[in-house]
A protein has these predicted regions:
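Conserved redox-cofactor binding core of oxidoreductases
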Residues: 90, 94-191, 199
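Glycine-rich NAD(P) Rossmann-fold beta1-alpha1 loop
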Residues: 1
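N-terminal Rossmann-fold NAD(P) dinucleotide-binding loop
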Residues: 4-5
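Accessory recognition modules or surfaces
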Residues: 28-36
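Short, hinge-like loop/turn segments at secondary-structure boundaries
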Residues: 35-39, 159-160
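Glycine-rich loop(s) and the adjacent beta-strand/alpha-helix scaffold that form part
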Residues: 10-13, 17, 24-28, 178, ...
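Short glycine- and Lys/Arg-enriched binding-loop motifs that mark or flank ligand-binding interfaces
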Residues: 20, 58, 62-63, 150, ...
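Redox-cofactor-proximal catalytic regions of oxidoreductases
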Residues: 37-117
């Protein structure tokens, strides 16, 4: 996904030996049929029906090379200043200032071909929302997006059949591979291996499209980058029994 692919590309570009494990399959635009019954099981955990314990919220969690960027709606805006301020004030991340983040944001925006959505691309529903926010005196804006030569087919959530969506699948993952990174799809990470207080690698299994496990995987590494999203990342930390001194992982 967005975190792992960017890290893999940057590290591979720097000359490091990089292995990427992705539980999902490596689908491409040729596989995107624009049919919900075919694409939902391919691109999402539990066919897009994963939900909270009480059933009140459905979680659209990606499961494919490219992660959630394959099925998201391509809205690309920078981390808002109030959020950066909260991270600095409440979490001690003093280096994350608006000024310090400007150059990294610009670099990513260039790589993803981020551009302003034009007024003629704003549909009637969103035009009505804009009029409503203005009438109420609320703040609102037309965001930017990372599409190139979009044909406006309307099937963003099922993967872009035209490679117009500048997802990790067509940007950072190919870049990482060109720099020598090895991307292993259908490879589920089950546990981060720790010995003598240091991370030594990742242990997992090969899985098929239905999630049925096969052969074992054992990757030895000096550094492990965990980039499995808001749900799978804490789950893997808990299963590995690491990085939870605070007791807040997964809460």
């Amino acid at each position: 996904g967005a975190g792992g692919a960017v890290a893999a590309a940057e590290l591979a570009d720097a000359g490091l030996d990089v292995v990427v494990l992705e539980q999902g399959h490596h689908w491409t635009s040729a596989d995107f049929t624009q049919r919900e019954d075919e694409m939902m099981p391919r691109l999402f955990e539990e066919g897009g029906m994963r939900q909270t314990e009480d059933g009140s919220i459905i979680v659209m969690q990606g499961r494919c090379v490219g992660g959630s960027t394959v099925h998201n709606l391509c809205y690309a805006f920078r981390t808002p200043d109030p959020i950066l301020r909260m991270w600095r004030d409440e979490h001690g991340l003093g280096e994350l200032t608006t000024e310090a983040m400007a150059a990294p944001f610009e670099r990513v925006e260039r790589n993803l071909k981020v551009k302003q959505i034009r007024d003629d691309e704003v549909n009637a529903m969103n035009q009505a929302i804009r009029r409503g926010t203005e009438a109420l005196g609320w703040s609102g804006f037309v965001t930017k997006h990372n599409r190139e030569a979009c044909v406006q087919s309307g099937y963003c959530i099922l993967g872009c059949s035209y490679d117009a969506k500048q997802s990790m699948l067509v940007t950072y993952v190919p870049r990482a591979e060109r720099a020598g990174a090895r991307v292993l799809s259908n490879a589920r990470a089950d546990r981060i291996d720790v010995s003598d207080g240091r991370v030594r690698g990742v242990v997992g299994r090969v899985v098929d499209h239905a999630g049925i496990p096969g052969a074992c995987i054992d990757v030895r590494a000096k550094v492990v980058v965990l980039a499995a999203g808001a749900i799978a990342s804490p789950d893997l930390l808990l299963r590995s029994r690491i990085a939870n001194r605070s007791g807040q992982v997964g809460r």
